[in-house]
Amino acid sequence: MLEANFADSNPLMDAWAAYNLKDYLTITVGQKQTFTNNREMIMHEKNLSMADRSIVSQYFSGTGRELGLFFESKLYLGKIALKPSIAITTGDGRNSFGSSSIDVDMGGLKYGGRLDVLPLGEFKSGNDGVGADFAREESPRLLVGGAMSYNDGASNKVGEGHGDFVLYDKEGDSKFPALRKIAADLLFKWQGWSIMAEYVNASATDLKGIYTKSTGDQPLQPEEIANYLNLGNGYNVQVGYLLKSGWGFDARFSKVKPEFKETETSPLW
């Protein structure tokens, strides 16, 4: 699959190839929407119920795309469907290697996974990847999921870019904090009704031995990490109803609580 947005300075959005191993495993290589973020960020932009993403998605993520290797599986326990997934990516988001030979990848890899449980059976084809209940599920359908990721060296506020800031070790070489994200979410649909609820937490680790100056005389203070990474907690709840005529009504409530108070140089400004 190949998809681009030429209104963007970095137009490449999706470029990947997948191999299906029977019915229970799909292996994908390339750049695509990762499943290690919150539920709304898994959905493609054109499949959202509202014009933009919630402030939770905007604060903790960028486009949600990663370059790497993705493993997606599907298992059944009677009527219950289990969907475990694992991803190993560059940790620099889309267009990971920049626009030139000197715009190189920074930091380490990103490791993530997700487990979705569908206790009432599967949604109709594709209906769990859109905001509204376009398929008008005849029976109630519920998805409960959890995801986590570990970005081993982030140099972008949400871990989807590189070189936006540089921190150092004692010797003056570049050294970046690790960014850890956890998400829990659910999606419910039935006869035109849709409910999505999600929680996200982002935290930084490996801060010891990091300095803000290459001279190695200004150690990074714990609260100063808010100047570089979007950390904290957030939750989002969205309820909608889709009429048979195609008209829909949606309401959303979102809140983000940063881990530390923002400063004039924090990513929020």
Where are these regions (language model features)?
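Outer membrane beta-barrel
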Residues: 1-94, 102-122, 140-143, 148-150, ...
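Outer-membrane beta-barrel pore domains
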Residues: 19, 48, 138-269
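Short, P/G- and charge-enriched loop/turn segments at secondary-structure junctions
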Residues: 55-58, 132, 171-173
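Short amphipathic alpha-helical surface micro-motifs
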Residues: 66-67, 123-130, 176-178
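A short secondary-structure junction signal
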Residues: 83, 95-101, 125-127, 156-160
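Short intrinsically disordered coil segments
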Residues: 86, 129-135, 161-164
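Short mixed-charge
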Residues: 121-141
